[in-house]
Amino acid sequence: MNSVERLPMPESSTSHSADPRDVESIDAIIAATYDVISGPAGQKRDWNRERSLFYPGARIMPTASVPGRNDVDLEPQLLDVEAYIARVEPLLQQGFYETEIARRTEQFGRIAHVWSTYESRHEASDAAPFMRGINSFQLFNDGKRWWILSIYWQHESADHEIPQKYL
């Protein structure tokens, strides 16, 4: 009989404890994810908060090989949380606000998949977004809190418009 190695359940994804309000529900963890990356030019992001949302070994996977480009040279980038922070931190020197505009959630037991359609702006007051796309979140609840296992996304482009069912 084959045995399966069980990994210990983490207290947090790093030494950074999550705010219980950020991880108490699917709505809360999705909102926290958008909140932590959004802010005005030059505002330092709370990367410890970001780290606390992710399960150890979680992946963040943009499909654009060059950060901030719309659907150019598509190639998944398999990043851990630290590599993601290093990739986006220079881009956040200008204002960046990402907001969810629609969501489809499917849940079975303690696992959930969330299709989260987003818009990105340089200023919260910008009339039109400079980018839109869809984030695919895979979540897990350990009985105490929700964790992000992965986020995978693609920006909208002329070749790949967001389908109506995701708006």
Predicted feature residues:
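Short beta-strand segments enriched in hydrophobic/aromatic residues
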Residues: I37, F54, Y118-S120, Y152-H155
